[in-house]
C-alpha cells in the first residue's frame, strides 16, 4: 500500500468521542467487547465516555503489523451479542467483521475507521479510509514506526 494515513492520539480521542456520541443513551448497553488488539484502545475510550464498566475482549488474530494472514479466534465471549457494542479500530477487507457478524448476530458492530470493502458490515464508524491506504495507529508510532519491544534484538 503506497498511501499512509497517520492517526495521532488526539485524533483517536476525538474520533472515539464522536463514536461514543452515536451510542447514546449509554444505558442501552450491557457492555463493550473490544476486538484485540486494535479495538482495545478505542474500547477503553468508549467505556470511559459511556460510563460502561463491563468490558471484555474478543481475540481474533488476522494481522502481523502490515501483513494479513489466516484468521484465528483465540478468545470469544459466549452469547449472541445482544446488548453489546463490539469495537474495532478499523474494518479493512471485512473478513474479521464478517466473522464477528456470524458469531454475534445481535451485537452492534462499530469501528473508528472503515475502508470500502468492509464499511457496509458496520453499524457505525467515523472515518472513511481509501482501500489502498495503510493506517498507522498512535500506539504503533512515535515520530516514526517503532518495533514492539518483543521484536528487538532477535
Swiss-Prot record:
Mg(2+) binds at residue 89. It holds the Pfam family Pribosyltran. 5-phospho-alpha-D-ribose 1-diphosphate binds at residues 37-38, 69, 88-96. Pathway: Purine metabolism; GMP biosynthesis via salvage pathway; GMP from guanine: step 1/1; Purine metabolism; XMP biosynthesis via salvage pathway; XMP from xanthine: step 1/1. The keyword NAD does not apply. It comes from the Bacteria. Its EC number is 2.4.2.-, 2.4.2.22. It is a peripheral membrane protein. GO terms for molecular function: guanine phosphoribosyltransferase activity; hypoxanthine phosphoribosyltransferase activity; magnesium ion binding; xanthine phosphoribosyltransferase activity. CDD domains: PRTases_typeI (cd06223). Keywords: Cell inner membrane, Cell membrane, Glycosyltransferase, Magnesium, Membrane, Metal-binding, Purine salvage, Transferase. It is found in: Cell inner membrane. It is an enzyme of class 2 (transferase). Guanine binds at residues 92, 135. Xanthine binds at residues 92, 135. Its cofactor is Mg(2+). GMP binds at residues 69, 92-96, 134-135. It catalyses: GMP + diphosphate = guanine + 5-phospho-alpha-D-ribose 1-diphosphate; XMP + diphosphate = xanthine + 5-phospho-alpha-D-ribose 1-diphosphate; IMP + diphosphate = hypoxanthine + 5-phospho-alpha-D-ribose 1-diphosphate. One of its GO terms (biological process) is XMP salvage. GO terms for cellular component: cytosol; plasma membrane. Purine salvage pathway enzyme that catalyzes the transfer of the ribosyl-5-phosphate group from 5-phospho-alpha-D-ribose 1-diphosphate (PRPP) to the N9 position of the 6-oxopurines guanine and xanthine to form the corresponding ribonucleotides GMP (guanosine 5'-monophosphate) and XMP (xanthosine 5'-monophosphate), with the release of PPi. To a lesser extent, also acts on hypoxanthine. Homotetramer. This is Xanthine-guanine phosphoribosyltransferase.
Amino acid at each position: 500500500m503506497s498511501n499512509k494515513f497517520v492517526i495521532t492520539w488526539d485524533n483517536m480521542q476525538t474520533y472515539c468521542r464522536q463514536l461514543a456520541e452515536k451510542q447514546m443513551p449509554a444505558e442501552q448497553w450491557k457492555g463493550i467487547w473490544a476486538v484485540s488488539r486494535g479495538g482495545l484502545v478505542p474500547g477503553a475510550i468508549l467505556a470511559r465516555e459511556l460510563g460502561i464498566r463491563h468490558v471484555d475482549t474478543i481475540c481474533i488474530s488476522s494481522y502481523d503489523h502490515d501483513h494479513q494472514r489466516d484468521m484465528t479466534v483465540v478468545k470469544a465471549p459466549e452469547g449472541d451479542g445482544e446488548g453489546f457494542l463490539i469495537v474495532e479500530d478499523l474494518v479493512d477487507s471485512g473478513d474479521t467483521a464478517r466473522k464477528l457478524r456470524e458469531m454475534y448476530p445481535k451485537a452492534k458492530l462499530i469501528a473508528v475507521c472503515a475502508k470500502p470493502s468492509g464499511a457496509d458490515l458496520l453499524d457505525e464508524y467515523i472515518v472513511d479510509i481509501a482501500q489502498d491506504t495503510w493506517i498507522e495507529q498512535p500506539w504503533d508510532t512515535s515520530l516514526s514506526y517503532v518495533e514492539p519491544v518483543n521484536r528487538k534484538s532477535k
